[in-house]
Structures are given as C-alpha cells and as structure tokens.
Amino acid sequence: MQLTVVEASLQQVVLTAPLAPNINHRETVFGGSASAVAILAAWSMLHLGLAAEGLGSRLVIQRNTMDYLAPIDGNFTAVALAPARRAWESFTRMIRRKGLGRITQAAALHYQGQVAGALAGEFVAFGPGYA
C-alpha cells in the first residue's frame, strides 16, 4: 500500500497513498485499498486519543460503511478528524467504568481537492483487564 503518515496529532490524522500499489483493473484505486487507508486513519485518530489519556486498550473495528463518491486515479489522502467532544467523553467514560467503549469515527478520502470517499466506522475499545 505504501502509506505515508503526513500528520498524526490529537486534532487529525492524515495518511497518503500512491495509486501504483493500490490500482485495480480500471486503473483507479482498488476499493479495498481505499477502505483500508480510511480505516487506518480513523483507527489511528482514536488510538492517539486513548494513548494521550493514558487509556491503554485493544482497539478494533466492529463494522463500517464506505461510500465511494468519485473514482481516484492518482495519489490520495485519508483524513480523520478528532471525534466530537461529547462522543469522546462518553466513549472514554465507558472504558473507565466498564472496561469497554464504543464510538463511531469518520474518515474522508481526498483526491484532487475533492472528497472522493467517506468512511463511518464503529470501533470498540477493550480496556486493561477486559477478557
């Protein structure tokens, strides 16, 4: 996939990937690659936030939807912004209380200045000691 991390902060995660290793038979980005890059951006955003709060956990994706809005036939980026404050507080509160939290995290695929894809992923964090 040849991903490159452009930014990884508590405000956003930005990943970029080239077309060549992610190409399909139509000479555009393979949908599976696009989805994987978006999921990784979303997962990384949550992982960074949990680490910053000292909430070591196992973070997994439970389900996702991916909307492909335009073909991508070149280098593209995936951007995940920090979750809304209220959603984040509820997520971390549940991890602290029950050792398990769920949150929906979005990521967008950008190509040539346009949004070319949108991910909505539901992630689950298992806190320390959760079996």
Give, region by region, the residue ranges found by the protein language model.
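Hydrophobic residues positioned within well-ordered beta-strands of beta-sheet architectures
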Residues: 15, 62-64, 78, 103-105, ...
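Hydrophobic residues in beta-strands and at strand termini
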Residues: 17-19, 68, 82, 125
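A short mixed-secondary-structure module that forms the rim of ligand-binding clefts
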Residues: 22-49
